């Protein structure tokens, strides 16, 4: 099926190529006019284009002139004039397609043209690279062209602070990796204020090596995770509290519903134990969950029944099979409460706080395009998932590479012996060689054999990748031997004799000149002369290497994907240079086992063919191609399946993030809160009045409603007015209670003041929304883990996931409404106007776990919660994403107290140092004598 679709998709190629040729011809027709311009006139075109766009012209209208402007600017600034085929590639990108351009055709330069054109709209352009080095290098090298034309260029790097990221995103053109862009999107949707957000939208993205990013890495989502709680010591404290509480006296237990409720005497005991006045004050609300979990752990979970303790670890016991569920933990802090009860180590637990797949992240962009040397084999997937067409751009010069037939050996050892022999023979002549391996282990194995043979070489793999760009750029030198995994070579050309631009840049940097910053002008002035000098040096070696046959590429194993094989071959034969490639295989290779090579091995044994004699057989080659096709189809189905499931989460994510963004941007929440009140009251009344009217339990309904707001009407009065409970009407009851709740809210606002109420609404909604969304992510993960079991009962797991996921989302939204209303009615706040300018304002976020932040300033009067002052605890966030070698990377940022001397001191207490100031104004102040420090763990 994919093959048929590929053929259908290629039918329109001719038409698109004719359109692109017309664009190149239009640019050529006006090129002389731009060549004749002075620098000032050429630079003035940017302002002219922006004015024309403001007057109603479209980007398509100005495209030929904009491309001609960039072509001439690139020639003057970096000495590179885009070829006609590069202009065609630029047109394909602007049209929202994937441009398949062979290795060495100058994709990096191609991206400059459409990025300039689209940046003129003022909405920003993102250029996505496969690693941080390329993002930095390309932003500096190609950024010189944009700077010349008056545009700003930024780059996103891992070590950058939020304020630096914000500046970079506000530039006209921003370079960065897919992981950095994706994580910034997630972090923006965890921010506590609009000022903390760094991205400004998703207008247009150009994805370099688009097949690697949108296909190879598509199955691994971006995940930000953090501890489900960060006050581990509270679990031990509340385990002690629970031991001292008496069942039916201090709390009640409903074993059937597996719930507990704390009674007034129990609350008093807890407050006395902790030394606080009111457990239900806003500052103390996180402690309530610790209390409930500790009592649940005591009464509802028992050793050797619901769990066992083994080697200092609490292991859940499956109630159906009786087996221990290693690695599984109860959520919402319950597992930690059980650990504290059993007096074993309370383990920190990470939970998903935010997640998105790369597929759904890049579908956020209004326009998406990409470049790669190998896209046609995945054209159907690009079309189905991203609605992207693939356009094969002709090469500037005819391909001269010779792709030799595969050589297949019986054993892996025999294969490597043949590879080493071939390398030794070619190396002796001086021909540069690139050897591709499928894993770090295989690259190290081959490296050891080359060392034993005395052949000098460079190794490039996941362990040794610090100098990736340098090694690849110099791999075309005479006599160079480079052993690399398939992570190598992305985005950096292997040029015969060496890379002129790389060598020129390296020399200027060695002299202390940088393409950006204070020395940018001197760097620019020195660039042309340095390039010309190095060109003459490289030219001689280039001709010498050409005479030796160009770059020789050796593949030591077929990859699962034909694209990666083609990518490896494509390192050779750039820009019409000669080159050669060959794959060495063995019947013990992983892919060979996939198509059951036993029959080949048996034939070789019967014929008594020695291990070191290769076979060249079309049937074997065909079988390998079929095996690759099967694996590619399986991987495509896997990615498609991931997307189907994530689409469920994506729809929910967009609803939550859109609501969250509106709150951050200052949306007036009054009407929404009143809708929350109406919905909450309606839900409570509906749930309590499902039976006949005479059976309604109004006492229980009123008890439940009083937990939400101070009910001002008496159900007995309503019952009397209706002439008995049997005559009461549900809709009338809802209307009466809604009116009563609105009046109570009006009184609440009058009590705290309108300004404070608006700020309280914003903070409460944000806090509750974030917490409920985190809990929902956990529940959805749990649902996803076991949903496949529905297939055994003849149910479609995806349909079941969609149905239950929707029900859970609806329940979460109801929970957000109810909890927001409850907090707004019941939080006890104290408003203070600060007298000292330097005093830090506190932010009321009773249950929200924010991204680590050192100083949150605001212009509002303080909303200060009375009661327990808790010492700050470490907050860690872990980031999980696909790395360059396909594994997950995990990073964590930890904020800790620099000095434990003041641990336990309340923020409003006098500082122990004797200054007479409050602790929060002295040693407890961020940036103060012992402030807060950040470290990466």
From Swiss-Prot:
GO molecular function annotation: ATP binding; metal ion binding; protein-exporting ATPase activity
Positions of Zn(2+) binding: 911, 913, 922-923
A GO biological-process term: protein targeting
SMART domains linked to this entry: SecA_DEAD (SM00957), SecA_PP_bind (SM00958)
SUPFAM superfamilies: Helical scaffold and wing domains of SecA, P-loop containing nucleoside triphosphate hydrolases, Pre-protein crosslinking domain of SecA
EC number: 7.4.2.8
Alphabetically ordered keywords of this record: ATP-binding, Cell membrane, Cytoplasm, Membrane, Metal-binding, Nucleotide-binding, Protein transport, Translocase, Translocation, Transport, Zinc
UniProt cross-references to InterPro entries, sorted A to Z: Helicase_ATP-bd (IPR014001), Helicase_C-like (IPR001650), P-loop_NTPase (IPR027417), SEC_C_motif (IPR004027), SecA (IPR000185), SecA_CS (IPR020937), SecA_DEAD (IPR011115), SecA_motor_DEAD (IPR014018)
Keyword Cell membrane part of the UniProt annotation: yes
Xref: PROSITE patterns: SECA, SECA_MOTOR_DEAD
A GO CC term attached to the entry: cytosol
Mode of membrane association: Peripheral membrane protein
Keyword Nuclease recorded: no
Signal peptide from the UniProt entry: none
Reactions accelerated catalytically: ATP + H2O + cellular proteinSide 1 = ADP + phosphate + cellular proteinSide 2
Region of interest called Disordered, as start-end residue ranges on this chain: 868-889, 915-937
Ligand binding (ATP): 86, 104-108, 493
Enzyme type, top EC level: translocase
Localization in the cell: Cell membrane; Cytoplasm
Cofactor binding note from Swiss-Prot or TrEMBL: May bind 1 zinc ion per subunit.
TM region(s), chain numbering: none
Subunit: Monomer and homodimer. Part of the essential Sec protein translocation apparatus which comprises SecA, SecYEG and auxiliary proteins SecDF. Other proteins may also be involved.
NCBIfam families membership: PRK12904.1, secA
Role this protein plays: Part of the Sec protein translocase complex. Interacts with the SecYEG preprotein conducting channel. Has a central role in coupling the hydrolysis of ATP to the transfer of proteins into and across the cell membrane, serving as an ATP-driven molecular motor driving the stepwise translocation of polypeptide chains across the membrane.
Family in the record: Belongs to the SecA family.
Name of the protein in its database record: Protein translocase subunit SecA
Organism: Nocardioides sp. (strain ATCC BAA-499 / JS614)
């Amino acid at each position: 099926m994919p093959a048929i679709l590929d053929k259908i998709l290629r039918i329109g190629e001719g038409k698109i190529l004719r359109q692109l040729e017309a664009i190149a011809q239009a640019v050529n027709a006006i090129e002389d006019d731009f060549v004749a311009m002075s620098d000032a006139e050429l630079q003035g075109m940017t302002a002219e284009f922006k004015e024309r766009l403001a007057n109603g012209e479209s980007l398509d209208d100005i495209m030929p002139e904009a491309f001609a402007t960039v072509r001439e600017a690139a020639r003057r600034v970096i000495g590179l004039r885009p070829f006609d085929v590069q202009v065609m590639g630029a047109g394909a990108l602007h049209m929202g397609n994937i441009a398949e351009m062979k290795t060495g055709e100058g994709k990096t330069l191609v991206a400059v043209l459409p990025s300039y054109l689209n940046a003129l709209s003022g909405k920003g352009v993102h250029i996505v690279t496969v690693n941080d080095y390329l993002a930095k290098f390309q932003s500096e090298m190609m950024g010189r062209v944009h700077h010349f034309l008056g545009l700003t260029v930024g780059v996103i790097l891992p070590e950058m602070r939020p304020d630096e990221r914000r500046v970079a995103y506000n530039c006209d053109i921003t370079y960065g990796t897919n992981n950095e862009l994706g994580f910034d999107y997630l972090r923006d949707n965890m921010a506590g204020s609009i000022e903390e957000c760094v991205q400004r939208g998703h207008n247009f993205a150009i994805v370099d090596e688009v097949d690697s990013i949108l296909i190879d890495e598509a199955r691994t989502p971006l995940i930000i995770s953090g501890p489900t709680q960060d006050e581990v010591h509270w679990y031990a404290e509340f385990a002690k509290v629970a031991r001292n509480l008496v069942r039916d006296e201090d709390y009640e237990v409903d074993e059937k519903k597996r719930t507990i409720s704390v009674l007034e005497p129990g609350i008093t005991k807890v407050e006395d134990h902790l030394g606080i006045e009111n457990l239900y004050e806003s500052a103390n609300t996180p402690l309530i969950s610790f209390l409930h979990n500790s009592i649940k752990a005591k009464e509802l979970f028992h050793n050797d029944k619901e769990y066992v303790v083994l080697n200092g670890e609490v292991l859940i016991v499956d109630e159906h099979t009786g087996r221990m569920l290693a690695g599984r933990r109860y959520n919402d802090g319950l597992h930690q409460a059980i650990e504290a009860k059993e007096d074993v180590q309370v383990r920190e637990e990470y939970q998903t706080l935010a997640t998105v797949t790369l597929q759904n992240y890049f579908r956020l962009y209004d326009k998406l395009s990409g470049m790669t040397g190998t896209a046609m084999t995945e054209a159907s997937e690009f079309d189905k998932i991203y609605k992207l067409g693939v356009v094969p751009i002709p090469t500037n010069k005819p391909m001269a590479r010779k792709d030799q037939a595969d050589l297949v050996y019986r054993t892996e050892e025999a294969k490597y012996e043949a590879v080493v022999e071939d390398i030794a023979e070619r190396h002796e002549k001086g021909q540069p060689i690139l050897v591709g391996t499928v894993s770090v282990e295989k690259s190290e194995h081959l490296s050891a054999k080359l060392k034993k043979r005395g052949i000098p070489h460079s190794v490039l793999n996941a362990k040794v990748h610090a100098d990736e760009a340098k090694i690849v750029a110099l791999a075309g030198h005479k006599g160079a031997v480079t052993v690399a995994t398939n992570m190598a070579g992305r985005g950096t050309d292997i040029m015969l004799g060496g890379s002129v631009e790389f060598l020129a840049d390296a020399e200027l940097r060695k002299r202390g000149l940088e393409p950006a910053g204070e020395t940018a002008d001197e760097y620019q002035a020195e660039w042309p002369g340095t390039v010309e000098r190095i060109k003459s040096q490289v030219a001689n070696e280039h001709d010498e290497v050409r005479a030796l046959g160009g770059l020789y590429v050796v593949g030591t194993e077929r990859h699962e994907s034909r694209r990666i094989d083609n990518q490896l071959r494509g390192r050779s034969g750039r820009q019409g240079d000669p080159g050669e490639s060959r794959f060495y295989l063995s019947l013990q290779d992983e892919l060979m086992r996939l198509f059951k090579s036993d029959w080949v091995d048996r034939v070789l044994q019967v014929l008594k063919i020695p291990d070191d004699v290769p076979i060249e057989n079309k049937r074997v080659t065909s079988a390998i191609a079929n095996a690759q096709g099967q694996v590619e189809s399986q991987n495509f189905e896997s990615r498609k399946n991931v997307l189907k499931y994530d689409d469920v989460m994506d729809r929910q994510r967009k609803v939550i993030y859109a609501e969250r963004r509106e709150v951050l941007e200052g949306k007036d929440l009054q009407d929404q809160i009143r809708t929350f009140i109406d919905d909450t009251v309606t839900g409570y009344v509906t749930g309590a009045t499902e039976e006949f009217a005479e059976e309604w339990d109004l006492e229980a309904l009123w008890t439940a409603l009083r937990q939400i707001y101070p009910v001002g009407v008496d159900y007995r009065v309503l019952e009397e007015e209706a002439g008995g409970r049997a005559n009461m009407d549900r809709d009338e009851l809802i209307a009466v209670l809604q009116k009563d709740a609105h009046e109570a809210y009006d009184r609440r606002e009058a009590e705290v003041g309108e300004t404070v109420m608006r700020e309280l609404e914003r903070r409460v909604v944000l806090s509750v929304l974030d917490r409920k969304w985190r809990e929902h992510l956990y529940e959805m993960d749990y649902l996803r883990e076991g949903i496949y079991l529905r297939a055994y009962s003849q149910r479609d797991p995806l349909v079941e996931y969609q149905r239950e996921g929707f029900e859970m989302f609806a329940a979460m939204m109801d929970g957000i409404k109810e909890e927001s209303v409850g907090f707004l009615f019941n939080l006890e706040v104290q408003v203070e106007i600060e007298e000292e300018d330097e005093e830090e304002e506190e932010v009321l976020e009773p249950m929200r776990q924010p991204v680590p932040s050192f100083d949150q300033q605001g212009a509002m009067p303080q909303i200060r919660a009375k009661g327990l002052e808790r010492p700050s605890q470490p907050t860690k966030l872990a980031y999980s994403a696909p790395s360059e070698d396909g594994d997950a990377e995990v990073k964590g940022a930890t904020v800790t107290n620099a000095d434990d001397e003041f641990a336990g001191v309340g923020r409003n207490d006098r500082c122990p140092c004797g200054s007479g100031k409050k602790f929060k104004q002295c040693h407890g102040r961020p940036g103060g004598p012992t402030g807060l420090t950040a470290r990466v763990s």
